[in-house]
Amino acid sequence: MKLTLHEIAKVVGAKNNVTAYEDVAINQIEFDSRKITAGDLFLPLKGVRDGHEFIQTAFENGALATFTEKELSADQAYILVDDALEAFQKLAAYYLEKTDVDVIAVTGSNGKTTTKDMIHDILATTYRTYKTQGNYNNEIGLPYTALHMPNDTEKIVLEMGQDHMGDIHLLSTLAKPK
């Protein structure tokens, strides 16, 4: 992923000033503080536990910065947003457009993963391709996949699953399959 902290802040509509980090490049985005490596941007999601509880751990593990819905101390680089998940999704949509990769989407009641894998394997004979890993096919997994694709990707095959009414619409709006 080739994005600077300043560019990310601009895309997601950060509520704080990050101009001091204009040239600071982010390696990748992680929502699991245990998987953070040096130069990553941490994404604190709310689930069974609030990911904000793990911001300090993420910094200790090498995070360069974090998204946050709460003010942090001035010595920590952060992007203040109203909703971290929404910011993550907005960033993924921007990144897919910026890279101009061809997006292929697979959805349905049964056979999504097998179909996605087959399409990927066929395209990989001619193009540099990337695909949804496992079944990361929801409102978190799809943006995660998009933001983790290699920089030289020409075709990305995204699996889209639905748990709630409107999920496919959301994912299609983010990915804009062609």
Locate predicted features:
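N-terminal leader/targeting and accessory segments in enzymes
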Residues: 1-90
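Phosphate-binding loop of NTP-binding sites
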Residues: 10-12, 88-178
